[in-house]
Amino acid sequence: MAAKKSTPTDSGKSKGKKNKAQKGAGQKGAGQIVVATNRKARHDYHIIDTYECGVVLVGTEVKSLREGKASLVDAYATIDEGEVWLRGLHIPEYSMGHWTNHSPRRTRKLLLHRREIDSLMGKVRDGNNTLVPLQLYFVAGKLKVELALARGKQEYDKRQDIKRRTEEREITREMGRRIKGIQG
């Protein structure tokens, strides 16, 4: 009779090396180190969909990012000849690098599956959509970009969002006061 291999679902505990699903690699929030966020993007755009992309970097860029230096303020992505490119991302020169340093605002290639690129191409071409990076973070030692398919907000949309958030805040405050009034 052959011995049955133990799997994580058999007994709840597995012996030996952990696989990627157990380590939490590639999952948002599990072992991720955030380098930079684009806080203005959620204010200026309606986020339709998000994608996790890899980035092609040179060595000094990675070292500079590990120091926590990057700016997504003017960054955006384009699709040229079937490839996705990140433009306007500012990664300052590495402090310990000399003649080997990179250009801070160079165009960087994003890594996505072909079907995702084709889908994005269609969505960007059809409507008034754009590709905006929301966040830069490390997962299992590799830099990832959270890329959003987004549509620009008009000024009145921004005002409506601010008004809605203010009303929600007032409602939660009032509920808190009522609960305290009943208990206290």
From Swiss-Prot:
Keywords: Cytoplasm, RNA-binding. Gene3D superfamilies: 2.40.280.10. Residues 1-11 have a biased composition (Polar residues). One of its GO terms (biological process) is trans-translation. Its main location: cytoplasm. One of its GO terms (cellular component) is cytosol. InterPro entries: SmpB, SsrA-bd_prot, SsrA-bd_prot_CS. It holds the Pfam family SmpB. It comes from the Bacteria. Residues 1-31 are annotated as: Disordered. One of its GO terms (molecular function) is RNA binding. Required for rescue of stalled ribosomes mediated by trans-translation. Binds to transfer-messenger RNA (tmRNA), required for stable association of tmRNA with ribosomes. tmRNA and SmpB together mimic tRNA shape, replacing the anticodon stem-loop with SmpB. tmRNA is encoded by the ssrA gene; the 2 termini fold to resemble tRNA(Ala) and it encodes a 'tag peptide', a short internal open reading frame. During trans-translation Ala-aminoacylated tmRNA acts like a tRNA, entering the A-site of stalled ribosomes, displacing the stalled mRNA. Belongs to the SmpB family. PANTHER family: SSRA-BINDING PROTEIN, TMRNA-BINDING COMPONENT OF TRANS-TRANSLATION TAGGING COMPLEX. This is SsrA-binding protein.
